[in-house]
Amino acid sequence: LFSLCXXXLKR
């Protein structure tokens, strides 16, 4: 999940 987001989750 994190890899796909990349950053999305943090955002």
From Swiss-Prot:
Protein name according to UniProt: Unknown protein 2
Originating species: Ginkgo biloba
